[in-house]
């Protein structure tokens, strides 16, 4: 008589992920919920700002500041009345006269206004602008223990101005934007990046990328962190080799006061055409 012993054994099959949701529809629903999910009051944010300039791997400029950022409610998504004030500033590393090219950031501290993609609908999240892009689902992921839709996007048309590609992270339950990663299409990037340059200098853009994150606090979602990175190469006519530069600007929100009626006076606001590196000694 033959006796056979059988031992139970569980064998987990590979997971099959099926995306039944329409990514464009999810983005549109999240846009419609912005007035509900984000602040409906005027807030005053405190932020730490830093901008750095690298020539190759060497830092040639580092400047820092403490900022006040006055933001109106997200209900109308209008940034015209949002302002930035530099409270304190310092230059940790100055560019030298021996550097053949001075690289400076125009309007840098205004990151908290212009690159708040959820508030500034002109940046990406506008229903008409969405028509310029195609969207597709990526694998979901957790951020702060909350499940997120991850939606890729890229241009589907060619326009006179540069478009973007990247990822949108949207909270599955609340349909709030929690993280936005974007890069500029390099085909028409020079106009978007370059403010002015010396005669005879050839400018070759390599990268313009953005990272914006938001944080949920007591049922509302608030701006948390912004980073802007620009990489480019420059060479002079009749020169054999080019030089690479990396310019990074970032702001992290360190404090927030809700329902603040005070606005930043125009004379104290940092304007979009000012250069923080040149003005840092005034603070």
Question: Would you name each region that the model predicts?
Answer:
Residues 10-11, 15-163, 189-190, 237, ...:
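Structured extracytoplasmic
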Residues 50-52, 154-156, 169, 183-185, ...:
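Outer-membrane beta-barrel pore domains and translocons
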Residues 161-171, 177:
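Mid-length scaffold segments of soluble, non-membrane domains
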């Amino acid at each position: 008589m033959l006796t056979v012993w059988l031992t139970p054994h569980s064998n987990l099959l590979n997971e099959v992920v099926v995306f039944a949701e329409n990514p464009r529809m999810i983005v549109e629903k999240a846009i419609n919920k912005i007035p509900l999910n984000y602040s409906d009051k005027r807030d005053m944010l405190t932020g730490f700002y830093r901008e750095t300039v690298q020539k190759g791997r060497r830092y040639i400029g580092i400047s820092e500041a403490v900022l006040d950022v006055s933001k109106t409610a997200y209900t109308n998504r209008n940034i015209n009345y949002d302002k930035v004030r530099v409270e304190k500033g310092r230059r940790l590393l100055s560019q030298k006269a021996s550097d053949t090219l001075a690289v400076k950031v125009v309007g840098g501290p205004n990151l908290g206004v212009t690159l708040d993609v959820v508030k500034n609908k002109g940046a990406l999240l506008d229903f008409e602008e969405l028509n310029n892009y195609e969207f597709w689902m990526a694998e979901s992921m957790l951020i702060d223990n909350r499940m997120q839709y991850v939606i890729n996007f890229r241009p589907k048309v060619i326009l006179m101005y540069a478009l973007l590609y990247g990822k949108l992270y949207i909270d599955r339950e609340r349909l709030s934007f929690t993280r936005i990663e974007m890069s500029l299409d390099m085909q028409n990037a020079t106009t978007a990046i370059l403010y002015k340059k010396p005669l005879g200098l050839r400018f070759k853009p390599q990268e313009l990328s953005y990272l914006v994150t938001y944080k949920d606090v007591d049922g509302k979602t608030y701006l948390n962190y912004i980073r802007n990175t620009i990489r480019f190469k420059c060479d002079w006519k009749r020169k054999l080799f080019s030089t690479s530069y990396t310019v990074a600007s970032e702001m992290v929100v360190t404090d927030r006061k809700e329902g603040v009626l005070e606005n930043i006076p125009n004379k104290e606001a940092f304007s979009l055409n000012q250069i923080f590196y040149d003005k840092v000694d005034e603070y």
